[in-house]
Amino acid sequence: MFERICLIVLDGVGIGELPDAIEYDDIGAHTLGNIYKTRGKLDLPNLYAMGLGNIENSRLPSVQKPTAAYGRMAQLTRAKDTTCGHWELMGHVMDPPFKTFKEFPEKVLNEWLQLANMPKAWLGNYPASGTAIIDKLGEEHMKTGAPIVYTSADSVFQIAAHEAIIPLSTLYKLCEIARKLLVGDLFVGRVIARPFVGAPGAFKRTENRKDYAVPPTGKTLLDALETQGKTTLGIGKIEDIFCKRGVKHVNHTTNNSDSIAATIDALKFNNEDTLIFTNLIDFDMKYGHRNDPDGFGQALEAFDGQLPKIINALRPVDLLILTSDHGCDPTTKHTDHTREYVPLLAYGANIKPTDLGTRTTFADIAATIYANFGLGKWHMGESLW
């Protein structure tokens, strides 16, 4: 049994299209493989040593003797968004998934702004890349003060606003009101504040993003661990994804560098019976959605460079799991998430390097952690060993 488990989610790092990718307009998606192909290289010596390239159809360099157990996981939830991906990792499959929209009803937007005591005027209200829509509508937004509303192929209601035009406190209030409205037939997974700064032609999104999710619609591993008195620590946006439910301790970091540092610190000081649950957001947010394979590759290489520090912070009784929540292939024709398998690497002093094969659900992670802490069999998924 492992006394501590560190689960790190490399947000948006997929490893090849799922069989149903055609239903999501994602034929040919392969986040890691296409980044490698586009750049001509991907310098990840530590991840390769663990066995990343040994995973089926990885399209990456393999090694003779991997140091970790390796495999890939399919998503059972019929979705490709962050919330559903993380919930499934924690053993809950949402069925049916959240609703997606091409546009939001005018009646709802009017009610939203009325409740916020703002003029009934908005910009956008269509699927778009976050950086593209502020480039297109940012100047008009600065002139009119109207918030920019947009969505994507995921279940999101996103509100972009210049911090000098709509203060953060007001933007967050707008999000809170929208979150209360978008339920029932309008059940959206996340409302997201997307603040930006700068002048026309040079707008830049800030790290003051804030996500407004809904509590999981069923019991998750985090709930079970909390009930059993285990310690849980959420790093990055984990608390937002689960609405703090089952997350005893929180370190709300906003970028990969800070999240990695927080994870290493947690490994140095946390005691036994602990789950450290980290989300690394930059791959997805800064590069995947912006169709930037070179930036994505550099971010992967930067993580690989920090990986030895994480490994060195592990104790002999620790387990490190690296995986993802969905794909976000930066080489696709769209800027949305991609329906892909996700990589799975499990490393520890007591782990026998082996091929874990193709898992049928992300919930195998929850089943593994639940069994590890001596709590029995999770209601879905199979333990990795």
Where are these regions (language model features)?
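Feature captures the catalytic ectodomains and active-site-proximal regions of enzymes
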Residues: 1-385
